[in-house]
Amino acid sequence: MKKLLLIVAAALGLWACATVPGQVKVTGGTIQGLVLEDMTVYKGIPFAAPPVGELRWKAPQPVVAWSGVKECQVFAPNPMQGNGEGCSEDCLYLNVWTPAKARRKNSP
């Protein structure tokens, strides 16, 4: 019985340590990208606090951390311009495309 319990505990530990494809940790928390055949795409990653209210016309402030996994699979609203359709003052987001087999060390 003890052996079975030990095996189950070890299996659960390994399962918990496994990485989820397209999931990475960034400054504010964990994000989930869109995994495609030859790349992973992260859309709408917040990189600073929204420049609204008291933060309007101020230098960017650090992003507010979130709990859980933030889905980063759709583009964030555009910055205010033109007719304002599909736009928002909350526009400090970035988009990242990475090769499917990205390496930890820099590429040339």
Segment roles from a protein language model:
Residues 7-15:
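Bacterial N-terminal signal peptides
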Residues 18-108:
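Non-catalytic accessory segments of hydrolases
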Residues 1-4:
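Positively charged n-region of N-terminal signal peptides that target proteins for export
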